[in-house]
């Protein structure tokens, strides 16, 4: 079975910001825009926003508009207004709209745009973000790309709108690597796959002949590390997405599990299972293939995840009796327990913002996804149920993705949830899905 490998090498497919802040596109603005979202104040009311169909010679403009609206709505911060309520029909997206028509339907912000095909076959995508109550333009940008990248253009535009109105980077122009699960429960086939963050453009990167688990992106998005049972014993592998080349990470005599990259992409941290049933944490330097042991205990130390600055590692250990969260220096120094609640903890992952650690918690017959400050204080459970597991952070540290299995028949599915715990959404995938890992923003 031939597997298509994704080319994630950074390419110049977009010519962005060509007209940003150009006099023909951007109006004079005060230092502070009237419309904005305070993303830091907890639960907020979604901002009503009107997103008009981008003008185009075919259905593409409407398709791009739908993706933008879906991205923004799924974040929980925006409430796209039904197009049936629109009063003004936009015929020239470059011209100032009739702001009164949009204020009548309480559109706090307005998006207009156009898609045109260039003589060289590329697409030109233009959009404008308007502050309707302030009566001014907030953004005017244009992008050039190939027709097959139209969905990515939509995600980039959604990111620009998100950032302008919240002050935070967006997370829509990203991918997720995960485990696709198909077939009956007794003969489940698990393949590694990559998709856009909204579930579109699924591509398989393994054939399912060997059980593969816990895939994780490298910081440059060009590699994936994962665990495979090829040969019968779990080992950690490194896969080059552009070429499909694969190599074993560390020639350890025992089983290696739970791999993850360091923030600079130069190391992989993982756990090595010992003959006595214990597991210790090691790193392998990808530059010279040297390995370093970080923990030495009779316990099971696993699930290591670096802080974004690379100075610390959070991991799970049962050295105190049951699995709890610990933090140590990146060299293995000064390990200290940070979780003090009831239950067992697993799959910790440090936020890209550096302020929180997400985890899975098992307590009182339920599996929960939660977050805690890096010193263990302020623990909050965001969602609980029969089986929730494996949180992964969006690159802006505002949203988590995880997998859930309901009681009874069936298999796991992917969900996202924000830090309020109120905005939970299922991500549609072709089959059952587990073990998601979010990529950094694409470039």
Swiss-Prot record:
Q: What is its main location?
A: periplasm
Q: Where in the cell is it found?
A: Periplasm
Signal sequence segment: 1-33
The alphabetized UniProt keywords are: Cell cycle, Cell division, Periplasm, Signal
* GO CC term (a single one): periplasmic space
GO terms of biological process kind = cell division; protein import
PANTHER family attached to this UniProt entry: PROTEIN TOLB (PTHR36842:SF1), PROTEIN TOLB HOMOLOG (PTHR36842)
**Subunit-level organization:** The Tol-Pal system is composed of five core proteins: the inner membrane proteins TolA, TolQ and TolR, the periplasmic protein TolB and the outer membrane protein Pal. They form a network linking the inner and outer membranes and the peptidoglycan layer.
HAMAP family from the UniProt entry? TolB
Regarding protein family, the annotation reads: Belongs to the TolB family.
What does the UniProt function comment say about this protein? Part of the Tol-Pal system, which plays a role in outer membrane invagination during cell division and is important for maintaining outer membrane integrity.
Write down what this protein is called: Tol-Pal system protein TolB
Gene of this entry: tolB
